[in-house]
């Protein structure tokens, strides 16, 4: 999902001072006194109980402290800018990843639409297969009828063999009339069933290929939870920031300085750890991009193989149709041969009936035509020979037709065996491809789970950044108050220094006036000297009192 830039980042151009105060752990402005602006005394010494010296304070350490403060502030500003740039880069990366996910989902929706279309085609092919199966069943029934008719012809030939025995008895012509009236039933194309199992198996293969295409994988990534020490450190800093600051001695100031340094080191460690986590996230994203490109290549290869398989299926269908045409032509030839054989059989039947009629007439005239008996026996022998010849010819025709049918059946069985072997090879290859595809789908789901976990971590980091921004804003306010109080103290210090300089000038003026009076009045003696001595003693005591008051105020 895409995320815009954080409003806190856009509204925080003054976070440099706050970040410096947060890292250094500066005290609150209301508790900052004059001792905070002065260099700390060693913790081993004890503060002097007497008044401070009357001379003005040297400004050199304060200037040095201000320069160090500015350099640190610039350093923290640079670090903050780097952190902002990295956060912006992280947000851009997440937006790019969300766009990639949307594109991937669109591709999967297209694949689903193709799969639905393929299923519709498979349904239509199944309907056609059912219709062809019905036609095949009808052809098989017709074939069985043709076989029954051929068996009836065999029975008729058996009756012809027994024709000799029928000469001695009265023939019954009408018994054979129903058999003569039987007409040959035309045989339809029965070879279409030879290739039917092959076509159905190919259709089932295509259906399984389309059904096994998986839906859109959904999941989330699994990665390690980084930055566990950062929340603990931040909570510790918040608790220490909430502690009330009280007026402390110089020793406590030194201990606070060491604590501030420790906190600074801890914050630097946290920043380094967060930086390492961001680098690890960027490496994981690059790795996922590579895997995504590989998946795209594999998907294109699978689509190409699918198109090739469809082409092969169309080629097999065309070959099947050609083979069906050839078999139908063979069946038509066979039907023509059978019709010619039926005509010959009809002629033989007519001749046999004529012979039977002649034999019947001669049987009636046997008593009167004993002389013609031998001739009739010879004719009978000739007829038997003809019947034997006809039987042999019929047997030869049967063997020829049976051998032709056996050859065609063997050829169709061999072709079917080859097609089954090719289908088994294709199924084996399909099983391997299916297994590889399932493995890749599992890897993709794992990668999606890792991406979602990364998104959760990014949300946590953003929440942490917002908390830090709030702390920075509070520290910035405290720093502004501290600067205001420092300016007030500086103004009061300047006023005290001006007062001390004025007092010093007055003291020098009084001393010069006393020296002039001593030089210009040597004649007055001890009285005037005693008088002026008492006044000078009073003035010196007052000056000392004023100096002590000034030093107390400065302290």
Curated annotation (Swiss-Prot):
Entry coiled-coil feature ranges: 72-161, 268-401, 432-522
SUPFAM superfamilies named among the record's database cross-references: Myosin rod fragments (SSF90257)
The keyword Cytoplasm appears for this protein: no
Gene Ontology, cellular component aspect: myosin complex
Entries under InterPro entries matching the protein: Myosin_tail (IPR002928)
Compositionally biased intervals (Pro residues): 37-61
Protein's name according to its UniProt entry: Coiled-coil domain-containing protein 102A
Organism: Bos taurus
Upper lineage: Eukaryota, Metazoa, Chordata, Craniata, Vertebrata
Gene (UniProt): CCDC102A
């Amino acid at each position: 999902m895409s995320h815009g830039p954080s409003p806190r980042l856009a509204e925080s151009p003054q976070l440099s001072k706050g970040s410096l105060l947060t890292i250094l752990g500066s005290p609150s402005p209301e508790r900052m006194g004059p001792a905070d602006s002065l260099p700390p005394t060693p913790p081993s010494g004890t503060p002097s109980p007497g008044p401070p010296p009357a001379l003005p304070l040297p400004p050199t350490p304060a200037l040095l402290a201000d320069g160090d403060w500015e350099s640190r502030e610039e350093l923290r500003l640079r670090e903050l800018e780097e952190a902002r740039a990295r956060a912006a880069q992280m947000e851009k990366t997440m937006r790019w990843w969300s766009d990639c996910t949307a594109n991937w989902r669109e591709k999967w929706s297209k694949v689903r639409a193709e799969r639905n279309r393929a299923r519709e085609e498979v349904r239509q092919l199944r309907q056609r297969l059912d219709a062809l199966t019905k036609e095949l069943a009808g052809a098989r029934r017709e074939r069985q009828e043709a076989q029954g008719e051929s068996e009836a012809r065999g029975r008729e030939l058996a009756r012809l063999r027994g024709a000799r025995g029928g000469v001695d008895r009265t023939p019954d012509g009408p018994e054979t009339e129903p058999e003569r009236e039987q007409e040959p039933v035309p045989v339809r194309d029965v070879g279409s069933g030879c290739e039917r199992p092959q076509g159905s198996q190919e259709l089932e293969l295509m259906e399984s290929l389309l059904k096994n295409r998986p839906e859109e994988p959904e999941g989330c990534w699994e990665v390690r939870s980084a930055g566990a020490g950062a929340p603990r450190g931040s909570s510790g800093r918040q608790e220490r920031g909430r502690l009330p600051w009280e007026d402390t001695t110089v020793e406590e100031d030194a201990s606070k300085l060491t604590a501030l340094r420790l906190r600074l080191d801890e914050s630097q460690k946290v920043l380094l750890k967060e930086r390492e986590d961001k680098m690890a996230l960027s490496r994981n994203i690059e790795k996922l991009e590579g895997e995504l490109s590989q998946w795209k290549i594999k998907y294109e290869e699978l689509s190409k193989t699918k198109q090739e398989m469809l082409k092969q299926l169309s080629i097999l269908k065309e070959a099947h149709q050609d083979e069906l045409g050839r078999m139908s032509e063979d069946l038509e030839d066979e039907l023509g041969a059978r019709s010619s054989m039926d005509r010959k059989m009809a002629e033989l039947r007519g001749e046999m009936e004529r012979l039977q009629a002649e034999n019947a007439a001669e049987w009636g005239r046997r008593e009167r035509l004993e002389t013609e008996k031998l001739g009739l026996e010879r004719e009978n022998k000739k007829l038997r020979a003809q019947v034997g010849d006809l039987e042999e010819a019929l047997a030869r025709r049967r063997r020829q037709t049976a051998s032709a049918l056996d050859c065609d059946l063997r050829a169709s069985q061999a072709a079917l065996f080859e097609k089954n072997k090719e289908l088994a090879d294709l199924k084996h290859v399909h099983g391997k491809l299916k297994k590889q595809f399932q493995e890749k789908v599992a890897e993709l789901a794992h990668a999606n789970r890792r991406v979602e976990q990364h998104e959760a971590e990014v949300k946590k980091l953003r929440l942490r950044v917002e908390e830090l921004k709030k702390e920075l804003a509070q520290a910035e306010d405290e720093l502004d108050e501290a600067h205001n109080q420092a300016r007030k103290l500086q103004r009061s210090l300047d006023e005290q220094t001006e007062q001390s300089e004025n007092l010093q000038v007055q003291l020098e003026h009084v001393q010069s006036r006393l020296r002039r009076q001593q030089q210009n009045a040597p004649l007055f003696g001890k009285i005037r000297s005693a008088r002026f001595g008492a006044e000078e003693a009073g003035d010196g005591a007052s000056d000392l009192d004023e100096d002590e008051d000034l030093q107390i105020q400065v302290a």
